[in-house]
Amino acid sequence: LEPAVQAWRVGDPADEATEMGPLISASHRSAVEGFLDGADVAFRGSAPSGDGFWFAPTVVLAGPADRIAREEVFGPVVAVLPFDDEADAIRLANDTVYGLAGSIWTENLGRAVRVSRGVKSGVLSVNSHSSVRYWTPFGGMKASGLGRELGPDAAEHFTETKNVFFATD
């Protein structure tokens, strides 16, 4: 994981080589930084200095009760938690009121299918961290929201069907 984080390119979003731009605002950057207060930071990548709300990708070693393992960060921070087996990993993943998105990393396709069935998340990636595509549904579960944006189901969640009957006699 460390070599991938070190290689992650943070920079100008107009540059095609950039993999992540700055955060949206100073207040958002501050909120993401707040998740690192008292956290066991294992390692960080790099980010530009100067103008912009830059934030280096960060990996944190966490426990199940840690804030970073229980809340949505909305920033380039990965919380790594130890687990005993598949059932324990699923229990840990679901032990939060949130369920927007997650990732499963494994070489075992059967394990990926089993775990993905058990994790309560609106979007789930296998061996990837970026699974949002405009042609596929996107949305959360639990306190992360209801409904789906994008994809063929999107219109259903932004419209309300109404039947109007006209008598012609």
Annotated model-derived regions:
Residues 22-33:
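Short beta-strand to alpha-helix junction loop
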Residues 34-39:
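Helical element adjacent to the flavin cofactor pocket in flavoenzyme catalytic cores
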Residues 15-20:
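Short linear capping/connector segments at secondary-structure termini
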Residues 40-47:
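Short secondary-structure junctions
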Residues 6-10, 47, 54-169:
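Conserved C-terminal structural/oligomerization subdomain of aldehyde/semialdehyde dehydrogenase
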